[in-house]
Amino acid sequence: MKLKPIEVAEILQKEIANINCLSELEEVGQVITVGDGIAQIYGLANVKSGEVVEFKSGVKGLVLNLENDSVGAVIMGDDNQVQQGDNVKRTKEVLEVPVGKALLGRVVDALGNPIDGKGDIASKEYRHIEMKAPGIIERTSVSEPVQTGIKAIDSLIPIGRGQRELIIGDRQTGKTAIAVDTIINQKQAHSLTNESDKIYCIYVAIGQKRSSVAQIVKKLEDAGAMDYTLIVSATASEAAALQFIAPYSACSMGEYFRDNGMHALIIYDDLSKHAVAYRQISLLLRRPPGREAYPGDVFYLHSRLLERAAKMSEAKGSGSLTALPIIETQAGDVSAYIPTNVISITDGQIFLESELFYKGVRPAVNVGISVSRVGSAAQIKAMKQVAGSVKLELAQFRELESFSQFGSDLDPATKVQIDHGKRLVEILKQAQYHPFPVEEQIVSIYVGTKKYLNDVPLQQVKEFEDKMLTEIRLNKKDILESIKNEQCITEETEQKLKAFLENFVKEFVK
């Protein structure tokens, strides 16, 4: 059968019309060298700093170094899956993580992927991990309290919503315990319906043992605190790149609450290991080392993270993000590089001492050098009324105590002051995982400052406090309710409290 030229032309036209001309243009480079979680890539001329690249195996990388003829990227995963000569393609995206309430109650990795075996997270919103901190006009001053439930902190070193308060101390001095107690203490607020009272919590584990993280998750589940808590975990066995980005990812998750008129608390545990992970990455990328071999921008590493914690203005929804960074010192040396950096960035520090810890003063807070620069504005009036003189009295007690070691003959007035100081120290002690509601803290500190404990033997102070609070909860609930609702001690309430305490002390000392 002979085809006419016109028919041939028609067939060709139909075939040409069916051809899909859409071709995808991809920028592809090649891995020159790989090792220690770092890949040097050749051929990605237009790649940006902070961009995500994808290796042949599907593992992602983050570009940090832009050099003349190659780029340096950190591998966010197992570097054994990346081989020399592998193709690498640009994604033209920066790192994003899922955010929102769907993450609450879950344990996720640094990239926001669930690692608790409870299935996928149905999150509709994603945010970049690196966000610009709010400007001065967008912020307002700190004015609402974050109740930690710890007497020594809420009375002497109060923390406000939007504040950055550093928890610093040697290993095994109870830094994480303070953070976990603060999370557990938010349970009371979450039982209320008012959204403005609630604080959502984010705990970031950086470079910790998996067993430690599992222990914290178990403790929070037992206390019923996981319902409003999210845990971001980048453990010691994970790539340094993941330990480096974990705090930024978690901060973006916290900013979702801050920017939607809610309140969030984020705990970075700990930023010492974060700085070590960044140092490792920087040295492997052959960046010039500075003091203690940290790179020159290690201050900016933490300042750009902690500046994202803020109390937003009314025009921006009045939300807040409070940060509690943790730093581990070596033999109490707070003048090392990273501790001094973070002290200068934050709005105060809670200093924990191993010496106090071993003496049985727990939480082992050194009240003398701990400070809260903005939190006192957020402290409720009732706490100011009772705790105003405690810091001074404790400072005088420490001074007298050190003098009394040299001589045995003390005049009666000094002896009375030392005995009073010892009882104040005793009343500020507290068991782990037992945060107190603020109204009960106020009653306990009132008892200490008004010298009701002078007749109580020192070793019975704890027993006295437990029995007194049990009695007041059962029979004098109106006193606690009045302090809670009025947020100050009215004359009427004080009279009731005095009458109750005078009777109780008589009964107890009998």
From Swiss-Prot:
Give the E.C. number(s). Answer: 7.1.2.2
Is Cell inner membrane among the key words of this record?
yes
Q: Which membrane topology term applies here? A: Peripheral membrane protein
Where is it located?
Cell inner membrane
Organism domain of life: Bacteria
Instruction: Mention any one GO cellular component term assigned to this protein in its UniProt record.
Output: plasma membrane
Q: Which Gene Ontology MF annotations are present?
A: ADP binding; ATP binding; proton-transporting ATP synthase activity, rotational mechanism
Name the predominant localization. Answer: membrane
Task: Site (Required for activity): give the residues.
Answer: 370
Q: Does the keyword Transmembrane helix apply?
A: no
Q: Which UniProt keywords apply?
A: ATP synthesis, ATP-binding, Cell inner membrane, Cell membrane, CF(1), Hydrogen ion transport, Ion transport, Membrane, Nucleotide-binding, Translocase, Transport
NCBIfam families referenced in this protein's UniProt entry, alphabetically = atpA (TIGR00962), PRK13343.1 (NF009884)
The subunit field of the Swiss-Prot or TrEMBL record says: F-type ATPases have 2 components, CF(1) - the catalytic core - and CF(0) - the membrane proton channel. CF(1) has five subunits: alpha(3), beta(3), gamma(1), delta(1), epsilon(1). CF(0) has three main subunits: a(1), b(2) and c(9-12). The alpha and beta chains form an alternating ring which encloses part of the gamma chain. CF(1) is attached to CF(0) by a central stalk formed by the gamma and epsilon chains, while a peripheral stalk is formed by the delta and b chains.
* Family (UniProt): Belongs to the ATPase alpha/beta chains family.
Which named protein is this?
ATP synthase subunit alpha
